[in-house]
């Protein structure tokens, strides 16, 4: 594949990388043909690669960088913390400070357990739900991605779907037999599976908007329905807010949609660009974690002072004006995508919520995993490569979503729209 862009150094690094790293990358979502560009630095809403190319970034490390890359306030706070140590193995006051910030924002949060990733957060939340209810089965929605662990890596989204492995080898059937799969946005399917497994379901886990299969929004009233039916059946409702937490609003999807879960899992934005995850929920549930209760969860780097410091500084800067501005930027780009696909008569559906957006090359509405899978992925990749050639980087998959940050200014948006027009004209 010939791209009209200089990537000589990235090509050399990729060839070397393949000798030492599986597939040349450390996460499948970073892999695309002929090879990914290698980043040398990042600042504001830009990535700079080893060949000197500048890219406007709408991937934002798959979501965390809402304040832009190399944000000075975060860097200064982290540099100051580094003088006091980088890992302790005992508690620090900053863990309390960040926990309070989470509790003040996330509606269901009465207590918090910090972990190191979104994967750890969902794994711990599911274990907690099973431990509390003494039930084994969980409900998961087709296409939802809740991390790379055995409980949920079944009909999964994100890189698992992009690279053709939504059901990973290496996961025993005995593990996945307790994972009940149903389509998103289908009330009848929820009622049916609960009825067929009465008293056996520990939890329903879901992304309130499915951000790992593009951008699939919940139907009006759907989240409220899930809240009601879980309460009626003693099922714990887990919102996986690794993407939506602190992005849709101060209180994440729960505040945005007006539905309160029992447990929320968090990550990405919470760490301000550093590794972190969190499980946040009702006190009577959270206190079942050890050492207070019997459900075991632990980690050497849980509550790491560097990540916690970055998280505190990040949340300080997420006010109402921030949410209004970042949502407006996504709305501008979404409207332009609609305008250009219509202008060039390209079958497409565009979805956005707050500062998240995505275009599907499809002539039908996208409400489920199967709808998303029916999209024209070849056309999407042509769109991706054209944007890349014109200095715009989006996630290289139909099954991810794009993000805006506070740093995407009017000039950047104008350049982006010009690149979109060129891409759509080619299609």
From Swiss-Prot:
Its cofactor is pyridoxal 5'-phosphate. The modification N6-(pyridoxal phosphate)lysine is found at residue 268. It comes from the Archaea. GO terms for cellular component: cytoplasm. Pfam families: Aminotran_3. The keyword Ribosomal protein does not apply. It is found in: Cytoplasm. GO terms for molecular function: glutamate-1-semialdehyde 2,1-aminomutase activity; pyridoxal phosphate binding; transaminase activity. CDD domains: OAT_like. InterPro entries: 4pyrrol_synth_GluAld_NH2Trfase, Aminotrans_3, Aminotrans_3_PPA_site, PyrdxlP-dep_Trfase, PyrdxlP-dep_Trfase_major, PyrdxlP-dep_Trfase_small. Pathway: Porphyrin-containing compound metabolism; protoporphyrin-IX biosynthesis; 5-aminolevulinate from L-glutamyl-tRNA(Glu): step 2/2. Its main location: cytoplasm. One of its GO terms (biological process) is protoporphyrinogen IX biosynthetic process. PROSITE patterns: AA_TRANSFER_CLASS_3. Signal peptide: none annotated. Its EC number is 5.4.3.8. It is an enzyme of class 5 (isomerase). Belongs to the class-III pyridoxal-phosphate-dependent aminotransferase family. HemL subfamily. NCBIfam families: hemL, PRK00062.1. This is Glutamate-1-semialdehyde 2,1-aminomutase. The lineage of its organism: Archaea, Methanobacteriati, Methanobacteriota, Methanomada group, Methanococci. The gene is hemL.
């Amino acid at each position: 594949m010939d791209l009209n862009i200089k990537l000589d150094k990235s090509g050399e690094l990729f060839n070397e990388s393949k000798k030492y790293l599986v597939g040349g990358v450390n996460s499948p979502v970073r892999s695309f043909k002929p090879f990914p560009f290698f980043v040398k630095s990042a600042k504001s809403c830009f990535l700079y690669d080893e060949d000197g190319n500048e890219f406007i970034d709408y991937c934002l490390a798959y979501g965390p960088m809402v304040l832009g890359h190399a944000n000075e306030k975060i860097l200064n706070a982290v540099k100051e913390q580094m003088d006091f140590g980088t890992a302790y193995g005992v508690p620090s006051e900053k863990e309390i400070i960040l926990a309070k910030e989470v509790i003040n924002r996330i509606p269901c949060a009465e207590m918090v357990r910090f972990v190191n990733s979104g994967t750890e957060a969902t794994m711990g939340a599911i274990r907690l739900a099973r431990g509390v209810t003494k039930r084994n089965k969980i409900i998961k929605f087709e296409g939802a991605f809740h991390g790379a662990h055995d409980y949920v890596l079944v009909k999964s989204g994100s890189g698992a779907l992009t690279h053709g492995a939504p059901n990973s080898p290496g996961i025993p059937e005995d593990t996945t037999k307790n994972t009940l799969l149903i389509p998103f946005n289908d009330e009848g399917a929820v009622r049916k599976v609960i009825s067929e497994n009465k008293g056996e379901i520990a939890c329903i886990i879901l992304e309130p908007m499915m951000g790992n299969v593009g951008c699939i929004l919940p139907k009006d009233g759907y989240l409220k329905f899930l809240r009601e039916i879980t309460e009626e059946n003693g099922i714990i409702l887990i919102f996986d807010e690794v993407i939506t937490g602190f992005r849709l609003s101060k209180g994440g999807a729960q505040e945005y949609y007006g539905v309160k879960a029992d447990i929320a899992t968090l990550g990405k934005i919470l760490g301000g660009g550093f590794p972190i995850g969190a499980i946040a929920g009702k006190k009577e549930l959270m206190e079942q974690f050890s050492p207070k209760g019997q459900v075991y969860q632990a980690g050497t780097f849980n509550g790491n002072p560097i990540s916690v410091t970055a998280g505190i500084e990040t949340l300080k800067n997420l006010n109402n004006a921030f949410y209004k501005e970042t949502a407006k930027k996504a709305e501008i780009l979404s409207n332009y995508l609609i305008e250009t696909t219509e202008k060039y008569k390209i079958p497409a559906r565009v979805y956005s919520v707050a500062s998240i957006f995505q275009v599907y090359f499809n002539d039908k509405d996208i409400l489920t995993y199967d709808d998303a899978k029916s999209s024209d992925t070849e056309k999407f990749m042509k769109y991706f490569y054209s944007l890349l050639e014109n200095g715009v980087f989006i996630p290289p998959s139909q099954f991810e979503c794009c993000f805006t940050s506070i740093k995407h200014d009017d000039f950047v948006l104008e350049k982006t729209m010009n690149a979109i027009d060129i891409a759509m004209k080619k299609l």
